[in-house]
């Protein structure tokens, strides 16, 4: 019986659905079909879009030719891939990157314009001249250096040209090698990187000086050249001054932050440096540490006499005689005595040679601006004491001078001023969050998919389920009038009580839902009614009040004759009533 009742209810539901669809009309049926097709399309698109595999990066920074070749190779291998909007990155599904790289490596992809020492792999030694070997060696060296330069941050592509010295037997002067580097730079490349490239190329090429390397970018801007010796020193000095000023500024901020708080002061530091190279040689002697090394003593004495004869010259002097008589003359005696002493000492000496190749601070200029409102808050009283701000400024000036290491002898200048800040304290120090528009744009794809699904479901409910539910809930006016006219008709109570015929008729006409509500009175009543067929229940109702049942049947016949479509429940109940 339960199976038969379920079959009858299912057939009744099918009949009701057919009747409801028939009442909708052609326009509503077409609209309902379009909404259903749109919903199915949205569901299918969403399932395909969300069900596709996630991708991971295979290669980045590729040229357009490499992307085309790699795309063809991956397509032949049956490996799905995708290309980013920038056109320089290839993506493959997660888990297939290793296989894709191995397959592309087998095909020799991605290729590089900067070929290195692999050039010798494809060259045969037969018929190869020394000139060709030298050219190939230079090309390989250029390619290897270019690959290394491309690994530097901010360098997207590089090209290296090297001119080596030619060896000649009759050449008087030695020719020095030179090199030039052309790079395609992107964000993050600085002037220091250009100097690093010069040092790299100079170290990779024998006998190449860094000053002989020229670096420029693809826009034609000269980044480093041989004639920038003075400019290079000036750039280095400016960089050192900036570093020193930044260090002093950090020291001042660390000293003032606990006292005033971040955002309540601003500092500015300018540093002037002396980067001249100095060489100093100093020799110091210690006279107290002398040691006697040698002593030399010279003594000299002499005795001399001088007699002078006063004899006249004549004939007598020419005659030989035994003895010549001397006449009295002048005589003198001289005696000399001299002593000389020389002592040599060893004295300790110290020679200091100093070479200064660094820098020294010539002058510091420091400016500090303090929020006056913050100073007044630290007073603790309202109004603050007299000259409170001036006293605080004096303390802060001394604190800043100590933190910065100021030296008045070299002309350092410091200025501390208290003013009212325009912006709220610390407003510029708060972290800036990303605007909500950026978040919305990043999630726009997910939002669009969700809105499409919700819109499709809403259209289906509005144009499809809503008319069905509305037609099911609307009862014919004639039925309600007939029931009101019929009144309450007593029906036999199988449990021992009684109920109205109107409730029984409403349960039969209202369909399975109304019939189930009536059967909830008790468990025993439900079981008995489940076993009883509809024909038996109608017969019992007719036996109890034939007049009211006849009135209901007349109303149904009147509705059928007027051209309105009868309810399927009424149509199924009329043959049974006639038979009864």
Swiss-Prot record:
Transmembrane portions of the chain: 29-49, 445-465
Topology in the lipid bilayer: Multi-pass membrane protein
Annotated InterPro entries: AMP-bd_C_sf (IPR045851), Flag_M-ring_C (IPR013556), FlgMring_FliF (IPR000067), FliF_N_dom (IPR006182), YscJ/FliF (IPR043427)
Main location: membrane
GO molecular function annotations of the record: cytoskeletal motor activity
Residue ranges, annotated region (Disordered): 273-340
Localization (cell): Cell inner membrane; Bacterial flagellum basal body
Keyword line: Bacterial flagellum, Cell inner membrane, Cell membrane, Membrane, Transmembrane, Transmembrane helix
Gene Ontology biological process: bacterial-type flagellum-dependent cell motility
GO CC term, one of those recorded: bacterial-type flagellum basal body, MS ring
Basic and acidic residues biased stretches: 274-308
Family named by the database record: Belongs to the FliF family.
Name of this protein: Flagellar M-ring protein
């Amino acid at each position: 019986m339960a199976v038969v009742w379920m079959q009858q209810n299912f057939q009744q539901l099918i009949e009701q659905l057919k009747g409801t669809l028939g009442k909708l009309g052609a326009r509503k049926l077409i609209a309902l079909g379009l909404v259903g097709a749109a919903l199915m399309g949205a569901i299918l698109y969403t399932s395909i879009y969300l069900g596709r595999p996630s991708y991971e990066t295979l290669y980045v920074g590729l040229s357009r030719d490499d992307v085309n070749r790699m795309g063809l190779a991956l397509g032949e291998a049956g490996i799905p891939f995708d290309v980013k909007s920038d056109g320089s990155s290839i993506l493959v599904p997660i888990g297939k990157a290793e296989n894709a790289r191995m397959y592309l490596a087998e095909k020799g992809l991605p290729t590089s314009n900067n070929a290195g020492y692999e050039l010798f792999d494809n060259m045969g030694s037969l018929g190869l001249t020394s000139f060709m070997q030298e050219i190939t060696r230079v090309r390989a060296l250029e390619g290897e250096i270019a690959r290394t330069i491309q690994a530097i941050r901010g360098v997207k592509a590089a090209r290296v040209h090297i001119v080596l010295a030619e060896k000649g037997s009759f050449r008087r002067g030695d020719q020095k090698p030179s090199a030039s580097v052309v790079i395609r730079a992107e964000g993050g490349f600085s002037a220091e990187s250009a100097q690093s490239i010069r040092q790299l190329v100079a170290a990779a090429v024998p006998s190449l000086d860094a000053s002989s390397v020229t670096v420029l970018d693809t826009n034609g801007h000269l980044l480093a050249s041989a004639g920038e010796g003075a400019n290079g020193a000036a750039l280095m000095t400016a960089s050192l001054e900036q570093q020193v000023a930044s260090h002093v500024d950090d020291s001042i901020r660390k000293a003032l932050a606990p006292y005033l708080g971040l955002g309540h002061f601003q500092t500015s530091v300018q540093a002037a440096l002396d980067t001249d190279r100095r060489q100093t040689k100093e020799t110091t002697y210690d006279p107290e540490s002398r040691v006697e090394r040698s002593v030399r003593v010279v003594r000299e004495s002499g005795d001399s006499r001088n007699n002078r004869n006063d004899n006249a010259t004549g004939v007598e002097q020419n005659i030989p005689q035994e003895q010549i008589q001397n006449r009295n003359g002048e005589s003198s005696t001289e005696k000399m005595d001299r002593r000389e002493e020389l002592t040599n000492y060893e004295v300790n000496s110290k020679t200091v040679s100093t070479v200064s190749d660094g820098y020294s601070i010539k002058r510091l200029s420091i400016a500090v601006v303090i929020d006056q409102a913050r100073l007044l808050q630290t007073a603790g009283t309202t109004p603050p004491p007299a000259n409170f701000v001036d006293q605080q400024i004096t303390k802060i000036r001394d604190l800043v001078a100590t933190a910065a290491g100021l030296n008045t002898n070299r002309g350092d200048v410091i200025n501390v001023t208290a003013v009212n800040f325009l912006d709220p304290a610390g407003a510029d120090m708060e972290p800036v969050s990303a605007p909500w528009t950026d978040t919305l744009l990043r999630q726009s794809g997910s939002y669009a998919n969700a809105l499409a699904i919700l819109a499709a479901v809403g259209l289906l409910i509005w144009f499809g389920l809503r008319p069905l539910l509305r037609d099911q809930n609307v009862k014919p006016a004639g039925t309600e009038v007939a029931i009101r006219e019929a009144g309450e008709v007593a029906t036999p109570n199988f449990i021992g009580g009684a109920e109205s015929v109107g409730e029984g008729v409403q349960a039969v006409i209202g369909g399975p839902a109304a019939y189930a509500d009536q059967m909830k009175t008790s468990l025993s009543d439900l079981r008995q009614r489940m076993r009883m067929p509809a024909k038996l229940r109608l017969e019992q109702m007719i036996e109890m009040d034939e007049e009211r049942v006849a009135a209901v049947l007349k109303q149904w016949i009147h509705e059928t004759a007027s051209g309105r479509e009868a309810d399927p429940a009424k149509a199924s109940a009329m043959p049974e009533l006639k038979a009864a």
